[in-house]
């Protein structure tokens, strides 16, 4: 793997000032192009389609993994917040646990995992 950073839930890359940062492999389980209720275009276009619960990478592949998973429980499927941030399933505890396991697995020794603050709403 030639990239040092893995973002496993990149979504619309809102985390980044440079949304084309060459150091980052942007992954998400979905692709989306839509117009939000306020008229702005919103695009989810990962470099690679991948599910954070089952990452297609070798052990110890990345120096930094960014894990900013969906955090919404009670929101409609087509709601503005669901489109932008994703939506948890009823099995969210097990799914996030599996995601953590996968993030740790693909991290190099003495590397860093960045977890964006989870606030379940």
Regions found by a protein language model. Give the residues of each.
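Class I S-adenosyl-L-methionine-dependent methyltransferase catalytic core
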Residues: 1-121
């Amino acid at each position: 793997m030639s990239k040092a950073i893995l973002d496993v839930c990149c979504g619309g890359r809102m985390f980044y000032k440079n949304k084309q940062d060459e150091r980052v492999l942007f992954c998400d389980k979905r692709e989306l192009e839509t117009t939000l209720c306020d008229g702005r275009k919103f695009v989810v276009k990962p470099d690679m389609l991948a599910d954070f619960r089952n990452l297609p990478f070798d052990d110890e592949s990345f120096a930094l993994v960014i894990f900013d998973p969906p955090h919404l429980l009670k929101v409609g499927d087509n709601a503005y917040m669901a489109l932008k941030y994703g939506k948890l399933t009823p099995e969210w505890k097990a799914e996030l646990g599996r995601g953590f396991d996968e993030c740790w697995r693909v991290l190099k020794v003495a590397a860093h995992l960045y977890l964006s603050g989870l606030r379940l709403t």
